[in-house]
Amino acid sequence: MARKCAICGKGVQMGMQVSHSHIRTKRTWSPNLQRVRAVVKGAPVRLNVCTRCLRSGKVQRSV
């Protein structure tokens, strides 16, 4: 699935962009996703993983 972490499920968040004159328009915040090769059930698989999961060691990367 696009723009979603395969480990924790973190995805896009919606909100408003507020200008100086308080005009509000919709905008999105995307998670920092990296496409990595990870070991899943003993086989290397390409996954979209957020950087928080990478830094915390929730992903075992393949070489």
From Swiss-Prot:
One of its GO terms (biological process) is translation. It holds the Pfam family Ribosomal_L28. Transmembrane segments: none annotated. Keywords: Ribonucleoprotein, Ribosomal protein. One of its GO terms (cellular component) is ribonucleoprotein complex. GO terms for molecular function: structural constituent of ribosome. Belongs to the bacterial ribosomal protein bL28 family. PANTHER family: 50S RIBOSOMAL PROTEIN L28, LARGE RIBOSOMAL SUBUNIT PROTEIN BL28A. This is Large ribosomal subunit protein bL28.
